Amino acid sequence: MESQQLSQHSPISHGSACASVTSKEVHTNQDPLDVSASKTEECEKASTKANSQQTTTPASSAVPENPHHASPQPASVPPPQNGPYPQQCMMTQNQANPSGWSFYGHPSMIPYTPYQMSPMYFPPGPQSQFPQYPSSVGTPLSTPSPESGNTFTDSSSADSDMTSTKKYVRPPPMLTSPNDFPNWVKTYIKFLQNSNLGGIIPTVNGKPVRQITDDELTFLYNTFQIFAPSQFLPTWVKDILSVDYTDIMKILSKSIEKMQSDTQEANDIVTLANLQYNGSTPADAFETKVTNIIDRLNNNGIHINNKVACQLIMRGLSGEYKFLRYTRHRHLNMTVAELFLDIHAIYEEQQGSRNSKPNYRRNLSDEKNDSRSYTNTTKPKVIARNPQKTNNSKSKTARAHNVSTSNNSPSTDNDSISKSTTEPIQLNNKHDLHLGQELTESTVNHTNHSDDELPGHLLLDSGASRTLIRSAHHIHSASSNPDINVVDAQKRNIPINAIGDLQFHFQDNTKTSIKVLHTPNIAYDLLSLNELAAVDITACFTKNVLERSDGTVLAPIVKYGDFYWVSKKYLLPSNISVPTINNVHTSESTRKYPYPFIHRMLAHANAPTIRYSLKNNTITYFNESDVDWSSAIDYQCPDCLIGKSTKHRHIKGSRLKYQNSYEPFQYLHTDIFGPVHNLPNSAPSYFISFTDETTKFRWVYPLHDRREDSILDVFTTILAFIKNQFQASVLVIQMDRGSEYTNRTLHKFLEKNGITPCYTTTADSRAHGVAERLNRTLLDDCRTQLQCSGLPNHLWFSAIEFSTIVRNSLASPKSKKSARQHAGLAGLDISTLLPFGQPVIVNDHNPNSKIHPRGIPGYALHPSRNSYGYIIYLPSLKKTVDTTNYVILQGKESRLDQFNYDALTFDEDLNRLTASYHSFIASNEIQESNDLNIESDHDFQSDIELHPEQPRNVLSKAVSPTDSTPPSTHTEDSKRVSKTNIRAPREVDPNISESNILPSKKRSSTPQISNIESTGSGGMHKLNVPLLAPMSQSNTHESSHASKSKDFRHSDSYSENETNHTNVPISSTGGTNNKTVPQISDQETEKRIIHRSPSIDASPPENNSSHNIVPIKTPTTVSEQNTEESIIADLPLPDLPPESPTEFPDPFKELPPINSRQTNSSLGGIGDSNAYTTINSKKRSLEDNETEIKVSRDTWNTKNMRSLEPPRSKKRIHLIAAVKAVKSIKPIRTTLRYDEAITYNKDIKEKEKYIEAYHKEVNQLLKMKTWDTDEYYDRKEIDPKRVINSMFIFNKKRDGTHKARFVARGDIQHPDTYDSGMQSNTVHHYALMTSLSLALDNNYYITQLDISSAYLYADIKEELYIRPPPHLGMNDKLIRLKKSLYGLKQSGANWYETIKSYLIKQCGMEEVRGWSCVFKNSQVTICLFVDDMILFSKDLNANKKIITTLKKQYDTKIINLGESDNEIQYDILGLEIKYQRGKYMKLGMENSLTEKIPKLNVPLNPKGRKLSAPGQPGLYIDQDELEIDEDEYKEKVHEMQKLIGLASYVGYKFRFDLLYYINTLAQHILFPSRQVLDMTYELIQFMWDTRDKQLIWHKNKPTEPDNKLVAISDASYGNQPYYKSQIGNIYLLNGKVIGGKSTKASLTCTSTTEAEIHAISESVPLLNNLSYLIQELNKKPIIKGLLTDSRSTISIIKSTNEEKFRNRFFGTKAMRLRDEVSGNNLYVYYIETKKNIADVMTKPLPIKTFKLLTNKWIH
């Protein structure tokens, strides 16, 4: 007998359950399952492999085995336990037959088996015919195919083999459903093969390998009858059996035929879904392959539409073709043919054969329509890979497959192929898509690569040869190993920080370790299966476990998404820190130059060009390996983005048809750029460029004009240069048809020199593309250099020349060389180059005196043409010099202050680069060069003359250190000279002296008032100091330190021994000096400034009356005293305790300094929001500060504690830029999508409620006839811009009801589909508050109504279509809208016009002019907010009459009729209102805040105590730049948006006492420092502690004949950034607070009086509008009043002086106030500061004062 041949173990592959085996019985060519069973589902593979691993029983192990029944697995492999039957039910050959049936003529050796006890066992009946095999045992059961090469034993050995060998044969499962018949047939065929009946199975041509015997046919019939009950057979099988009940062979033949057909279709679908193309194969072959697949599928009934096909193709594009995925997917009607046109075009560009396939070239219009951009700013996408594939690459270089340098994937819209709204379908099995099923977008397997990582797990990767991890927390024995080279799947280098050990502690208490590499530049933590295999650990994906070879289970495997993962809990943590890991390459010899530094050094060229140039040695001094390229792929230079912004790139190869090949320097392109306006006369206004066609060498020459002689001089120079330097003669010069080229003078010159002029033809810009693109490139570089360096614009040509020098030295990927190499010149030595605008110090060899400084600050421009020196710009001398005597000025801060390049400080790199060039400061330099007098060869820049009429930004004069500057400060500043960060000025003023010519980081002028007269006991003193002097660095540091102390209580207090003058050091933007100024009262300041400006600040005489009220106008009908008392009587002003007489201290004694920082936003202002403070000033001292806010910041800081992670790239956020960038608060989404509310909602009860709401909404839509149900439209027939996307949104209302709404995606609606002039109006909050206040005073009934589905009552005029709701199942159809669906741009306006028309025509209402959505008639007032209506009426029947009329047309629900005389509770537009008619009204939001604030994840009551105030005075927001990584920054900004969004909503509803804090913190949403977050937490904490507070209104006295409308105003001078003031106003109607406003002044005020005028002028327009509204709603007379605590402001308003004001802006405001007072019956009165409740709107107050000003109107 032939010996058994057992296969060896194959390597364990990713996803395989065990080793694959091969027996001699398996046929390689004739097996009919080659096209079917070989692609069965994974469960079938697993069961087959598990079956092949079973061992023989001990009784039969010693018996020779039958070669046809060979067990291919060694006995050491345990049998699987996860089959459909228990282990004891596994059948031998005898067990596979019914009881009593003899096998091969031998009696059954097992009369009873557990299998026969199965409930699915079909016992044989008496009529059953069991096969009795012939007695000739030599007849084999199956005949091998000729190709198999198998031989069989003779008859004598066959009998012994059959009786001695028992092979376990797994029976097929029972058929339980007709739909499962295809899968069951496959298992049944496997059963026949394992039973040695493979030869009788029909092949692909429908014929078996051998003839079936009668016994075998009987066996076939009986087993088929047992395992396939007739009730579960499909119809076509029953049809066959009805003709011949024994024709099992025909059933098998038909089944195999269907398998073959399905397999081909499935293979095509899988191939189509996994297309990959990167240009490595011809585009024709790729197109043929794709079109053949699509044609086959279409012919077989599987329709692939154009959009799906294009999406599948685009998903597989990579390399240069990848951009098509982000540009072409937006074209809805794109075809496959159009997509392949783009692919062919790119392929031709790659191959350089632009004329090979002209039929694929697109015209220019196609290019424009495509909006194609070659600039790929997105980051590489992570490739979705089947984790079960094995990487067979044997490259010596370690490869980490599927590793990306970023977690961000390209973002696409809803139609993109990278997203899907349905569950992904894996197209890895042929039965995933059945015959006739259409392949739609939802069928394609999409993966969101930004969300596919399983946190806390390692990804198992069979393709990675090394293990990589991002966190250093688990790395043991870390060490530097720079020799390791790791690349990802795209062959990009991955920088490795360190190598170490990864130690595992598995669940069986065993420990092991493998090598691991540390890098933060990967998307996942990768665990290599190859390295696990090296330590005897394999992955079994059948059991989903990690196990040893002996079967010991170590850890479970989790399948998440497309990948398999292992938990990190089995990793042992190490004690190594992140800085330790990341500092392993800190040695000077191994540290590489950062790419951003090289990028700036080489004129901001792109990374591929720089890298190629270094590789080809066109740039010398260092190699490609000396540069850190890790950030080159994702690096975005802000200066390049600004300076080189463009639409799209040019068309490559567009000029080939216009010229032939020429030798170097024979064919030149030239063009002129200019003019550049607003430049000094000495600076050039034009430049002319020349480019050689062959070498691409460039020349640029400056021009002051475009005269003929100027152009001729340049042509003469360039021709002579080429002839003498390159021994070449120019033959052709290509140029445009400008007059400077077509003039007779130049034409004769060219003709004389034998040069052919080549002019462009009309409308043929492509022919002149070389010169024009060069000019554009140089101008891009110029803008970028000027932007980066900050140099003035008149140095623009120096930037052009610097760019030309660098670009001549960079290699072209096309020509493989640089222009200098083509010209035969040496490469550029980068060590001789400085970044453009690099600050340097130039030696002055001939100073004015011996004690004069020898160094002159300057800025490096470019290497000199005429010497070995460098062209340097000296601002103090206003000229450029050519010198070698300079030293690089170093600074620890980035010079690029406009953009923060992740802390780009290149001083050390620059020192290493220029180490071989010693400066004049070196001690070994004994001779001084006198070449400072050598003027630059650029005469146009030697002596800069500025136009006197040109406007300039004049810098503030530097103050001498002797002016009240402490000596220590000056000394410290002097020591920092070498580290000063000097930046060039944008413009140079000819009047600026040398002492102040150097630029500052921020160019802002400080408001100054000179010659301020100060009155003292000794007489008049004149001070020539700025009003706001800059603070010294030392004082700034002390102030910062003081503001950050743990005790936030202000420690400064006044004593009787201190004077009323304070030296206030105030930080000035960019300033380095400080001054001390006396603190002067408002009245004194205004009184002294009046000598220069007679009318702006005139102070009135002191009024020492008890009320301190100055009436401005006295009406004839009311006495002055009565009007004053009438206005103030009902106001909720605080009751002040009696004060003792004030003892004024000696004016010459100094008050303690108030530490402040002028440039910072603060919650405490400057000296409590005043630059000048005296005892008799309106600003209070801080001695009554009883601040109790002592919440430890440590409590807040524990919120965002992060685990040890590798450092990420930091993002610097500048305070002022962040504050200026805040336009509005981003709304936070509070609704749920369909998948969140229903599909994936795990809360069953809530899900059912949402489903109910969903059906209710659909029924309402149908009831309202929202769309046309008579006709459905094909999507291809409708203009895409008229198709509106739609979606369902769900939310839970405050009353607990669940609501669904079908809305349109108006945010992406095309502008042509709506009228932008239409307005969607809602009632203003002030109108609602006014109506509520009048309702209380007049005993009105308040009725609240709701109109269901209000928008759907409004018809839509435009032709718009939407996709049907999901439940209709018509994805390819469209329906036309008839009603205004929620979400459309025009829906709100349509509804407003509809309801407005109905209320006016049917209800007899009229809209109040100027107040939209406020309607009235003689009895009823209506406030309308979309579908909510609030009705106010003296007679409840009048309200009921309106309701009856509304119900005739609309589905109107009465929320609250308001008929009770007891307290009634309302919920009106978010306000929780308690109203008892004729008594009081309380407005609050307690229930809403109780629900919402805990959801903000803010730690509430960390100390178990309540806060008494929302903020505290004396605390300033630090202006230091914020360094934070990108993810954390976005997270904190999002958190700030949520917190400030809620606070703003509450503040503007009724908590007007919080508006100052809300407004200040809202300006810092984009600056989420720890300090800002702490202050925001305190604000939310205070809101939580006072959530039960209410705005209290009481009914006005019935005897009052008039309505009194009052605005109380206040301003805090200069307490905001850039000296802006905070202004605030509170509005009261009949003593009830109805609104408030706190904001930063739009203009910069120079005095407290100007700030107060600004505040009052801001309140007057709203005051007049409210007055008109009140008169329309209530016919009582109205008295308007303005209250302010500024006497000087009242004096200005009262004055009739017509002289000019000092400031025309505030003069205009003051004159307007005069007109308002004189013409609109407006009364202006003085109010004491301690009673001014508007004070809470402009500054933080001590707790005692805060409570005193607010407790009467909100409590």
From Swiss-Prot:
Q: Where is the composition biased (Polar residues)?
A: 1-23, 48-60, 127-152, 1005-1015, 1054-1082, 1101-1111
Binding locations of Mg(2+) 2:
1346, 1427-1428
Pfam families cross-referenced by the UniProt entry: rve, RVT_2, TYA
User: Function of this protein?
Assistant: Capsid protein (CA) is the structural component of the virus-like particle (VLP), forming the shell that encapsulates the retrotransposons dimeric RNA genome. The particles are assembled from trimer-clustered units and there are holes in the capsid shells that allow for the diffusion of macromolecules. CA also has nucleocapsid-like chaperone activity, promoting primer tRNA(i)-Met annealing to the multipartite primer-binding site (PBS), dimerization of Ty1 RNA and initiation of reverse transcription. The aspartyl protease (PR) mediates the proteolytic cleavages of the Gag and Gag-Pol polyproteins after assembly of the VLP.
Q: Could you tell me where the Basic and acidic residues compositional bias lies?
A: 1038-1053
Miscellaneous field: Retrotransposons are mobile genetic entities that are able to replicate via an RNA intermediate and a reverse transcription step. In contrast to retroviruses, retrotransposons are non-infectious, lack an envelope and remain intracellular. Ty1 retrotransposons belong to the copia elements (pseudoviridae).
EC number(s) from the headed UniProt entry: 3.4.23.-, 2.7.7.49, 2.7.7.7, 3.1.26.4
Q: Which keywords does this chain's UniProt record carry?
A: Aspartyl protease, ATP-binding, Cytoplasm, DNA integration, DNA recombination, DNA-binding, DNA-directed DNA polymerase, Endonuclease, Hydrolase, Magnesium, Metal-binding, Multifunctional enzyme, Nuclease, Nucleotide-binding, Nucleotidyltransferase, Nucleus, Phosphoprotein, Protease, RNA-binding, RNA-directed DNA polymerase, Transferase, Transposable element, Transposition, Viral release from host cell, Virion maturation, Zinc, Zinc-finger
A cellular component annotation (GO) from this entry: nucleus
Q: Which residues bind Mg(2+) 1?
A: 671, 736
Please state what the protein is called: Transposon Ty1-LR2 Gag-Pol polyprotein
Where does this protein have compositionally biased stretches of type Low complexity? 153-165, 402-418, 960-969
Q: Which Gene3D superfamilies match?
A: Ribonuclease H-like superfamily/Ribonuclease H
Q: Which reaction does it catalyse?
A: DNA(n) + a 2'-deoxyribonucleoside 5'-triphosphate = DNA(n+1) + diphosphate; Endonucleolytic cleavage to 5'-phosphomonoester
Question: Where on this chain is Bipartite nuclear localization signal (motif)?
Answer: 1178-1212
Question: What is stated about domains?
Answer: The C-terminal RNA-binding region of CA is sufficient for all its nucleocapsid-like chaperone activities. Integrase core domain contains the D-x(n)-D-x(35)-E motif, named for the phylogenetically conserved glutamic acid and aspartic acid residues and the invariant 35 amino acid spacing between the second and third acidic residues. Each acidic residue of the D,D(35)E motif is independently essential for the 3'-processing and strand transfer activities of purified integrase protein.
Domain named RNase H Ty1/copia-type is located at 1610-1752
Question: GO BP, one example?
Answer: DNA integration
Q: What subcellular compartments does it reside in?
A: Cytoplasm; Nucleus
Q: Where is this site: Cleavage?
A: 401-402, 582-583, 1217-1218
Q: Which organism is it from?
A: Saccharomyces cerevisiae (strain ATCC 204508 / S288c)
Q: Where is this region: RNA-binding?
A: 299-401
Q: Domain Integrase catalytic, which positions?
A: 660-835
Q: Which CDD domains match?
A: RNase_HI_RT_Ty1 (cd09272)
The UniProt annotation places Mg(2+) 3 binding at 1610, 1652, 1685
- Which gene is transcribed and translated to give this protein? TY1B-LR2
